[in-house]
A protein has these predicted regions:
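Short hydrophobic targeting helices and cationic amphipathic motifs
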Residues: 7-8
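Short, positively charged and aromatic/hydrophobic N-terminal segments
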Residues: 12, 17-22
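Hydrophobic alpha-helical membrane context
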Residues: 16-18, 60, 86, 179
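N-terminal Rossmann-like or analogous alpha/beta NTP/dinucleotide-binding catalytic cores
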Residues: 23-166, 186
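Thr-Gly-centered strand-to-loop micro-motif
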Residues: 172
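Glycine-rich, Lys/Arg-enriched anion-binding loops that position phosphate/diphosphate groups
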Residues: 175-189
């Protein structure tokens, strides 16, 4: 289930057999009979108490009863930052936090989105099948682009729902817990 990602391995593990980060998609035909749950987090800032109580703690509590997939969605993070160079380091730190709070890579699958090429591949297919009108109606794009202080608004922010739909479809998930701000994106999927 896991592969060696050197920069994570060197920084956060002193030994062991795997880094806990996957780079390949699991075949649903050979996976568990437990419900598959996909939950992801962007590496865009410090993990706070709300992240811990609302996401990380439930992830740890559910990892034994679910076929749990937890992603560090660094490609999504690129849509909302004007400093893309910091996303890589933030992803490493978020992975360390995942493991520090108790996510067990022997039980749950943890992946770094940019290391799974199928995210971009299926994301492109989704961009080509979701209409411009559907994407234009996404309230999260309107909200986030209105809050930008700079003139630059990423095209990736506009097509974000297509990549999120690809994330979900790629892992053939049964459950995708999201907040209200993501509900429209799930409906596209």
């Amino acid at each position: 289930r896991c592969c060696d990602i050197n920069h994570l391995e060197k920084r956060y593990r002193s030994g062991g057999e795997s880094s806990g980060i996957v780079s390949v998609v699991t075949d649903p035909a050979t996976s568990s009979t437990k419900p598959r749950v996909l939950s992801c987090m962007q590496p865009t800032g410090d993990v706070h108490l709300g992240n811990y109580l609302g996401a990380l703690q439930p992830w740890v509590a559910g990892q034994d009863r679910n076929d749990a997939f937890h992603g560090i969605v660094d490609l999504h993070a690129l849509t909302v930052t004007d400093k893309p160079g910091v996303v890589g380091q933030a992803a490493v730190e978020l992975a360390a936090m995942f493991f520090a709070v108790g996510l067990n890579p022997d039980v749950a699958t943890v992946f770094l989105q940019s290391h799974v090429p199928e995210h971009n591949q299926l994301g492109w297919v989704m961009e080509c099948t979701i209409s411009f009108g559907e994407l234009s109606r996404m309230t999260q794009f309107k909200d986030k682009s209105a809050k930008r202080e700079q003139d630059f608004i990423s095209g990736g922010l506009f097509s974000y729902p297509a990549l999120q739909a690809a994330d979900i479809l790629l892992y053939d998930t049964n459950q995708v817990p999201v907040g209200d701000d993501q509900r429209q994106h799930i409906e596209i999927t």
